[in-house]
From Swiss-Prot:
Enzyme class: transferase
SMART domains named in the record: RPOLA_N
Family annotation (NCBIfam families): rpoC_TIGR
Name of the gene: rpoC
The keyword Magnesium is assigned to this record: yes
Catalytic reaction(s) noted: RNA(n) + a ribonucleoside 5'-triphosphate = RNA(n+1) + diphosphate
Full protein name: DNA-directed RNA polymerase subunit beta'
Record keywords: DNA-directed RNA polymerase, Magnesium, Metal-binding, Nucleotidyltransferase, Transcription, Transferase, Zinc
Chain's role: DNA-dependent RNA polymerase catalyzes the transcription of DNA into RNA using the four ribonucleoside triphosphates as substrates.
EC number: 2.7.7.6
Cofactor: Mg(2+); Zn(2+)
Top-level taxon: Bacteria
């Protein structure tokens, strides 16, 4: 099916001297005359006695070449001197046996056979060309019905189907010669050959212009695309029917003799034999003038045999082999993980590599790894042989090998010499990000295990419990140079995903450093002494050494010598440093001996987070080399100090808080009160469950804090070892500590629901049998989840890599004026991600001034922000910054360095050719796998991340913004809408209206912002002054209340008992509650409020959702602020990353979420218009233009807006997640990009994973690359077709130059799988998924792959056009680029207008 050119091009192909690859459909002539070396007529394979190939069979030497080098079949010619001679006896050419891997043959078919790919792959290519349905075609192809090819003068129609009875009837009526009707492949061949594609194309275009129905247009456009593919290529449609079948070279389908006279064979041989047998039988039958029924059956069987050969199982039952296993057809050879693409072309096994178990090598330098001598000897063998020959120690390779095997002394000397400066690559599977392969200088060691530096373990995610690593030797000078310059471990100390240090001390090292740097615990004054003062650090170190620095003495923890000198390592001392007297400890002075001087004196405790910050600071101030030295010193110091400190944990170190009994008693009392409330009917069962869980969550936190305070206390001026371990970040966390000494807390059932009664014991006290049994659920769920999710995460990474693999940095600056706007991310009043972190390393698109001072420029347009600039912008209180982004980059291919910003792995501007797409995919995929390993449980109120009350953080004035409130009888303000917030502003003596105006125009910044929920009770009036710590509002956590805002009398509307409502007696309380239930009728349950008891004047209506409990009675008089009904919030299940990974997948695959929310299509005011077919009609009316937009909303959905609410375009009207496609259609590209980036970040942020926005932006960019044609104008584009933005603009430019009408299009959001398959390169798409469909599609339109991306070049064995290969590739491709002029488009602003 590939068309690489004639046989003469084979040499070029072998050399790799081609820069594009075209695929097409092979004609019968090509198969027979160009590809084939002979026809196979017999199904035989090899002779059972001689084991030699049978002549004319599937392994024939005459056709395929000799099985032994330079030897013919009969043995007449046996030497290289006869090269090229064709034996006159056996007809075999004397040549190399490897030609049997290249030479093909063919089978001449008795009747034409339809290629199953073109008929069965959706959409059916043959069906679309002929305009026939797949089922009709199937009946013709498999000899069930006739199809009319030429109706002649009869009343039949071309392509009409005739069954046997009808056919006989027609023959009787008109005679056999009056028309032509056939069956099978022959019929399809004739129909395809007679099809005039040019006129069909014109006819389809006409019909497309005239058709108004969207569905019909889409159908026509699809057919048009296939027909156009044939017309514009050199393919003929009848080539989709085969007259000859190519036979794969025999060495690609080997027959291997096993012990005991049996053979192992490739499944293809069986499939070919079936075809040959049936074909030969059919030829014989046709010669014998056999009855039509038998012939027809034989033809059908041949068609099925060829189907099975190409794609077994695609039609009918698959052909089974031995052991009832389906045979692997040609399609299977290409498809899936074990297919040709992924197994052999994208992933090859590598020579000069080995693997072994890893152990820790604390004595190594950062750039070293320990390589076992035996391994090194094997890996560096060729280098050793060359050196031995150069030295004259040996003269032949064989003798050198023998010498190596003997282990002669000079071999070891040579090995030592060679290994110097020759880096090796270490790799640990799974390689989730680029830090999974790093280069090291090998150091020869005894033993059989590879030694690894402890600081690189984090990057490899390695531990020493039996992990294995692979070693690879870079052979060429270039490869060695790349490994040295780019891949050495010291160059990879920062994560490319976030720029945070990855080589940070952990476990023992952290503990040792923390111990050394701990706060003073020994104060001489308390022991009747005096604080010692030292003139400099050297004196302190002398005193330490004099004290022996061994910590045994009970009182002060040091060993004094005879003169009474010596100091405690944690003693408070004074010392002069840089001319200043500082209070510190000897430990800190000791630690500072390894800190680079530029960083100053570090005089504070050092948990792991601080160490990480110190490393980052060190890199910024003193550069890479000094940082790596510092890291090695940290490692050394950490291990030594943790060993000397000999910190170990005993059972007594786990202190149980004394207040535990009291707190538990109090909690049981509270739970009893909640239960009583439920029994009295005040709250629902859901609320009771929810409140109970809140109580226990609070108890858990209280006890956890009490325990932490308890172990923080020092005894005998010594630290609690448990506290040291947790606080330093070496091992354990607060939650594990809580389980050891406080209580285990709430547990989840296997289904995720939280069990109300917690485990009140801790591990020190021991668990009861019941408690142990409950807690075993969680432990098992964790393990099962881990196993299942790792696969999901790996698949997500694969899809991400595939969609972004060809995004590389192609130029320095694209010159775009487009930008995106970023601001601080807040949750309530808490700052989750400060602005400085979001803008660091990004390019500013316009000047940034100090607010109120235009002369002070903080950053100029085009600046890539440094951390100092980012900090200055944040400090200046600037709300948002306009930055350039890959989302708005206008590079012709790939993206530009300026739009991308800094390379986070080294803090420099990203270089040309850098594979940023793959880095982005790895950055998002790698934590996915990590997260699946830990399952987080957030239970009860913790899960809703909200608290029952809002407290002012500082003094100020409270301003209500966008809030509708009603004052209840107690004088509290109740919130009636969902979108408002409370703002705390500085008291500047302004009026309330001024404050509101300034806030809504963002002219002033609030000190704190509190978003408030529907039904919240605000305790302070609008505009009132509040003080820090004052309660501002109470939030209703367990119900969504429906509150009345006007006085009047209640009237039930459509609240029909037994239909839309039901009275339910509460099992526990015995009280009867009126609950609105789900119903199918045309009822619209609502409560109407009338001004008078006669129900004449209507004041307002309130829609009541299903599941709500009604709190008022018919005819009851009510006051504003009273509760009409309440909708209990569902029992809160535990959240874990199971919610996270599928959510990320859902976002990047652009799937429609379940129970999606409805969003407003225009700005306006909400109104209701009754009910239609179980759906509520909600109208948004624009007050100014009078424009209306109707929304049909299911009655089961909960509305979060009410009549009269003002909404803005894109605002949610109901609960649930938003459909991304709707955001695109309603709010435009910019809003969608912002939404997707923030939503993905939200998932990772919840897990405490830090990923830079730019990585997610690249994936989103790839999802928004296509546009959908809405009006093709005079272009060659088709209606409903998805085309690349660049292609669209180029086509429009051409059309406009020719004076034609340009096409119109709207942006379209594609999921990553669809986007990967829509890539320009068919090789890349075929190696991803749907291999057969992609290849069929490409072959029909004779697609050309210009080999511009990574995957296609790896598959073709070329150098990849990225990294160090970028420049080389650029030169090769320059002539291609000349053909296509460089264009810079302003895509996004154009589309904004279309979408908006």
């Amino acid at each position: 099916m590939f068309r690489e050119g004639s046989r003469d091009d084979a040499a070029l192909v072998k050399e790799g001297l081609f820069d594009k690859l075209e695929i097409g459909i092979a004609s019968d002539v090509t198969i027979r005359d160009k590809w084939s070396c002979g026809e196979i007529k017999k199904p035989e394979t090899i002779n059972y006695r001689t084991f030699k190939p049978e002549k004319g069979g599937l392994f024939c030497e005459k056709i395929f070449g000799p099985t032994k080098d330079w030897e013919c079949y009969c043995g007449k010619y046996k030497k290289i001197k006869h090269k090229g001679i064709v034996c006159d006896r056996c007809g075999v050419e004397v040549t190399l046996s490897k030609v049997r891997r290249e030479r093909m043959a063919h089978i001449e078919l008795a009747v034409p056979i339809v290629h199953i790919w073109f008929f069965k792959t959706t959409p059916s290519r043959i069906g679309n060309v002929l305009g026939m349905t797949a089922s009709d075609l199937e009946r013709v192809i498999y000899y069930e019905e006739y199809v009319v090819i030429d109706p002649g003068n009869t009343d039949l129609v071309k392509k009409q189907l005739l069954n046997d009875a009808k056919y006989r009837e027609v023959v009787e009526k008109w005679g056999k010669d009056a028309f032509v009707a056939k069956m099978g492949g022959e019929a399809v061949y004739d129909l395809l050959k007679s099809e005039d594609l040019e006129s069909l194309l014109g006819e389809l275009k006409d019909r497309l212009r005239k058709t108004k129905s969207q569905q019909a247009r889409m159908k026509l456009a699809k057919r048009l695309k296939i027909v156009e593919g044939f017309v514009s290529s050199s393919n003929r449609p009848e080539w989709m029917v085969l007259k000859n079948i190519p036979v794969v070279p025999p060495d690609l389908r080997p027959l291997v003799p096993l012990d005991g006279g049996r053979f192992a064979t490739s499944d293809l041989n069986d499939l070919y034999r079936r075809v040959i047998n049936r074909n030969n039988r059919l030829k014989a039958i046709l010669r014998l003038k056999t009855p039509e029924v038998i012939v027809r059956n034989e033809k059908r069987m041949l068609q099925e045999a060829v189907d099975a050969l190409f794609d077994n199982g695609r039609h009918g039952h698959p052909v089974m082999g031995a052991g009832n296993r389906p045979l692997k057809s040609l399609s299977e050879m290409l498809k899936g993980k074990n297919g040709r693409f992924r197994q052999n072309l994208l992933g090859k096994r590598v020579d000069y590599s080995g693997r072994s178990v890893i152990i820790v090598g604390p004595e190594l330098k950062f750039n070293q790894c320990g390589l076992p001598k035996e391994m090194a000897l094997e890996l560096f063998e060729p280098f050793i042989i060359k050196r031995l020959k150069d030295q004259g120690s040996v003269y032949t390779i064989r003798s050198a090998k023998k010498m190596i095997q003997r282990g002669a002394p000079e071999v070891w000397d040579v090995l030592e010499e060679i290994i110097k400066g020759h880096p090796v690559l270490l790799n640990r599977a799974p390689t989730l990000h680029r830090l999974g392969i790093q280069a090291f200088e090998p150091v020869l060691i005894e033993g059989k295990a590879i030694r690894v530096h402890p600081l690189v373990c984090a990057a490899f995610n390695a531990d020493f419990d039996g992990d294995q690593m692979a070693v690879h030797v870079p052979l060429s000078i270039e490869a060695q140079l790349e490994a040295k310059v780019l891949m050495m471990a010291p160059d990879n100390i920062f994560l490319p995903s976030s720029g945070k240090p990855v080589a940070t001390p952990s476990k023992d090292m952290t503990l040792g450093i923390y111990y050394l740097m701990a706060d003073p615990t020994y104060f001489p004054e308390e022991h009747g002494g005096k604080t010692k003062a030292f003139k400099d650090e050297v004196e302190v170190l002398r005193a330490l050494n004099a004290g022996g620095f061994i910590l045994k003495d009970e009182i002060c923890g040091s060993r004094r010598d005879e003169t009474g000198r010596g100091i405690h390592i944690h003693e408070k001392i004074k010392v002069r440093i840089d001319g200043q007297i500082i209070e510190t400890t000897p430990g800190r002075v000791f630690f500072n001996t390894i800190v680079p001087k530029e960083l100053g004196f570090q005089n504070y405790s050092m948990p792991s987070k601080r160490i990480s910050e110190l490393i980052l600071q060190c890199y910024k101030k003193v550069g890479l080399e000094a940082t790596v030295r510092f890291l090695d010193d940290l490692k050394e110091l950490g291990f030594v100090q943790s060993t000397k400190a000999a910190i170990s944990m005993g059972l007594k170190d786990v202190k149980i808080p004394e207040i535990k009994k009291e707190i538990l008693k109090d909690a049981y009392d509270k739970v009893a009160i909640v239960k009583k409330q439920y029994e009295d009917g005040i709250i629902t069962d859901g609320e009771r469950h929810s409140k109970t869980i809140s109580i226990w969550t609070e108890v858990s936190d209280l006890l956890s804090n009490a325990l932490y305070s308890e172990i923080k206390k020092q005894t005998n001026s010594k630290h609690n070892p448990l506290f040291l371990m947790v606080d330093s970040g070496a091992r354990g966390n607060k939650s594990q500590l809580k389980q050891l000494g406080a209580l285990r807390g709430l547990m989840a059932k296997p289904n995720g629901a939280i069990i109300e009664s917690p485990i009140t014991s801790n591990f020190r006290e021991g668990l009861t049998v019941l408690e142990y049994s409950i807690s075993s659920h969680g432990a098992r769920k964790g393990l099962a989840d881990t196993a299942l999710k790792t696969a999901d995460s790996g698949y997500l990474t694969r899809r991400l890599v595939d969609v972004a693999q060809d995004v590389i940095i192609t130029e320095r600056d694209c010159g775009t004026l487009n930008h995106i706007e970023v601001s601080t991310i807040r949750q309530g009043s808490e700052e989750l991600l400060p602005l400085k972190d979001r803008v660091y390393g990004r390019t500013v698109s316009e000047n940034i001034y100090q607010p109120g001072d235009k002369s002070n420029v903080l950053a100029y347009a085009g600046d890539v922000l440094t951390s100092a600039q980012a900090e200055a912008i944040d400090d200046a209180g600037i709300e948002s910054v306009k930055i350039r982004s890959t989302l708005t980059c206008e590079s012709r291919r790939g993206v530009c360095a300026k739009c991308y910003g800094l390379n986070l792995a080294n803090g420099h501007l990203i270089g040309l050719g850098e594979a940023v797409g793959i880095i982005a995919a790895q950055s998002i995929g790698e934590p996915g796998t990590q997260l699946t390993m830990r399952t987080f449980h957030l239970g009860g109120v913790a899960a809703t991340s909200s608290t029952p009350e809002i407290v002012a953080e500082c003094d100020g004035i409270l301003v209500y913004l966008d809030l509708r409130v009603v004052v209840d009888q107690e004088g509290n303000n109740l919130v009636l809408n969902k979108m408002g917030a409370l703002h705390l502003v500085q008291d500047e003596g302004r009026s309330l209206s001024e404050y509101k105006k300034l806030l809504s125009t963002k002219s002033i910044e609030s000190l704190a912002t509190f978003p408030v929920e529907l039904g919240a009770k605000i305790l302070v009036n609008d505009g009132a002054a509040v003080t820090a710590g004052q309660r501002i509002a109470e939030v209703e956590l367990h119900n969504i209340p429906i509150i009345c805002d006007k006085p009047g009398f209640v009237h039930y509307e459509d609240l029909v008992e037994g239909v839309s409502t039901e009275k339910v007696a509460n099992k526990n309380t015995g009280l009867v509650e009126l609950i609105v239930k789900q119903h199918r009728g045309e009822l619209h349950p609502q409560i109407a409020i009338y001004a008078d008891a006669n129900m004449k004047e209507l004041v307002g209506t309130y829609a009541i959702p299903s599941g709500a409990i009604i709190s008022v009675e018919e005819g009851q008089r009510i006051a504003p602020g009273m509760l009409l009904a309440r909708l209990p919030r569902g029992a809160i299940k535990t959240k874990d990353i199971t919610g996270g990974l599928p959510r990320v997948a859902e976002l990047v695959e652009a799937r429609k979420p379940e129970d999606a929310a409805d969003i407003a299509k225009i700005d306006g005011v909400v109104d209701f218009k009754g009910i239609q077919k179980n759906k509520r009609i909600l109208v948004v009316r624009d007050e100014i233009t009078g424009m209306e937009e109707e929304h049909l909303i299911s009655l089961t959905k909960h509305l979060i807006v009410q009549r009269g609410d003002s909404v803005i375009k894109g605002q949610q009207l109901t609960d649930g997640l938003v459909v991304p496609h709707e955001i695109l259609a309603i709010c435009g590209v910019r809003e969608l990009q912002k939404y997707l980036v923030n939503e993905v970040q939200e998932v990772y942020r919840l897990q405490g994973v830090d990923i830079n926005d730019k990585h997610i932006e690249i994936i989103v960019r790839q999802m928004l690359q296509k546009v959908r044609i809405t009006d093709p104008g005079d272009t060659t584009l088709l209606f409903g077709e998805d085309v690349d933005k660049k292609e669209f603009y180029e086509e429009n430019r051409r059309t406009e130059e020719d004076g034609g009408k340009p096409a119109q299009a709207v942006p379209v959001l594609l999921g990553i799988t669809k986007a990967s398959l829509g890539t320009e390169s068919f090789i890349s798409a075929a190696s991803f998924q749907d291999t057969t469909r992609v290849l069929t599609d490409a072959a029909c339109s004779s697609k050309t792959d210009y080999l511009l991306g990574f995957k296609e070049n790896v598959i073709m064995g070329h150098m990849i056009p990225g990294g160090t290969g970028f420049d080389t590739h650029k030169r090769i491709k320059q002539h291609l680029e000349k053909e296509q002029e460089d264009l810079v488009f302003d895509f996004d602003s154009e589309f904004e207008s279309v979408a908006g």
